[in-house]
Structures are given as C-alpha cells and as structure tokens.
Amino acid sequence: KTPAPVGIFGPGWKAPSDIRLQIRDDALVLNDNGGRSIHFEPLLPGEAVYSRSESLWLVRGGKATQPDGHTLARLWASLPPDIRLSPHLYLATNSAQGPWWILGWSERVPGAEDVLPAPLPPYRVLTGLADRFGRTLTYRREAAGDLAGEITGVTDGAGREFRLVLTTQAQRAEEARKQRTASLSSPDTPRPLSASAFPDTLPGTEYGPDRGIRLSAVWLMHDPAYPESLPGAPLARYTYTEAGELLAVYDRSNTQVRAFTYDAQHPGRMVAHRYAGRPEMRYRYDDTGRVVEQLNPAGLSYRYLYEQDRITVTDSLNRREVLHTEGGAGLKRVVKKELADG
C-alpha cells in the first residue's frame, strides 16, 4: 500500500497538492492520492532522473545550471536561484516546457518536547508551482491545529492572495443539524438532509483514516491591481454529501455549475455528473469497479469491453476503437491504439 489518502475534494478526486515525496536512505518514493508510487534512486544535489513509465522528471536542487544540451537546462534556468541552489528542495515535471512542481516542507509549531532546531522531515510536500516564464504559485500550509499541514492560502505571481476555506466532517455535520433545526421551525424552508445521516466522523479507507477535511470555498483576499475592489462572495464554493463526497460546485454568482451523484455502496464511485445547462451523463460499472458504459442522452454513448491485453471502446454509432495494453496491475500501459477510421 502507498500513501493515497482521501484528498480535499473527497474520495475519487485528485488535486495537484496531494503529491508527496518520501525520502528514504535507499530510495525516493513519489506518491499521489491516486495510489501511484514511483520509485527513484537517491539523488545527489543537482542530479536529475527520469521515469520512462510515468514520463516524469525528478530533480534535486543544489546546482545553478544543468549541463548544456540537457533536456531540462532551459527550464531549470527559469527557476529563481534560491530554489535551484537549495539541496533540500526537490522538483518534478512531466515536460521540458514545465511547469515545475516544487517539493519542500511546511513550517509547523514545535511541540513542548521537540528538540530545536527541528530536523527536516523525511518527506516533501508541494509548496509551489513555477512555469518556464517565471510565473509562480506559492502555497501556504497551516502550522498548527486540526488543519496542520493543509493548504489554506495561495499567492500567484501577480501578488494576488487567495484563501482556501477548509471544513471538517464535524463542522459540516453541525451545519446540517442547524439547517434541520431551522427547517423544522419554518415550514417554508426546504428540508435538508437528515442530520442523523450526517456523521461527525468518516470511516477509514484501505489506505488509512479519512480526516474529513474538504475544500469548501476559495476567496480572493488581496489584489494589488484592484485593492479596493475585492469580491464580496467566494470565487468558488463546494458542497459535499454526508459521506464526504463532492456533491456540487458553485461559481462566484452562487450558480451551480457542476453536480455529481455517487454509488451509495461504493464511496467515491461517481455514477453521474452534470454541467449547468447540459444533460446528465451516467456511468455503469462491472463488479471490479471498471466503467462498462457511459450514457449520454444528448450525444454519443460508449461501451467498454475489457480483455487480457486490450480494451474495446464502441460508441452508439457502432464505431470501434481498440486500446492494446502490456503489463499487469498498476504497471499496465497502453502501447497501441486502433482508431475507428483506421
């Protein structure tokens, strides 16, 4: 098992911030919350290594320049010197065009028994992004409390500051209880989900406990270009089911722009989704959790047939594509694709 915890959008969803690098004596292990575990040999300062199976570069800081002719030489030179020269930072990218994922560590409030100065942790987390033009995103993580280590602030290269509002399962359950109480006292208020169905904690997954921390809203807090014209509502808002699954997304006008439905027996298994103003797209699965049919009432639908080394995709016009695969389990890869038109 690899560290693949439920992320800030709930089970079944991945976010770039979920990337994590384990630093061991004999290996470097890059994990995401999709369960991928990419192993590298330990790196010397400034050294770079490439994973062919994942098309991913990993580079350790500690060198001002990469050798002439190196695939990443120009992209490396676009980084600020303090990042390039730090041997304690690691950087990952899947393209010579960028962007870089900057892997560092978050500050935390030391405990009463901690020895100071505290050593660096045996892992790295995403602390920022940088593209080949020098534009950056910097992530700020909570240093203490229930949200310690979670991203609660982002600053972009233009100096705009964003606040990420995170909620716990207990907070969402309390809000559900308040809404239910209000609905009982006012017959005109829509009846919310039963508070008894909204637990204060969530069950664990095969990878470990689900802390129930979810992203609820994104606010613009500072804009150097328009400091007096900040919006009075969040740029985006997210709601969740009683099981912590992403239920709906709202834009800054409080208009619902996305909606999702899940299988009650399989947390995080999405069976339908819808964009605002569009018909609902539905999915059917087999007993192993693979999608076997995608149903679109206003367009093309698809059927998926899984065989040992091939996946056949047939649309509702009876056109067929075939994906040929090699390998097994988590190392299975598509090696050839037959298109419907040859």
Label every PLM stretch briefly:
Residues 9-16, 26-342:
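Extended charged/polar low-complexity repeat regions
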Residues 23:
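Phosphate-centric recognition/catalysis
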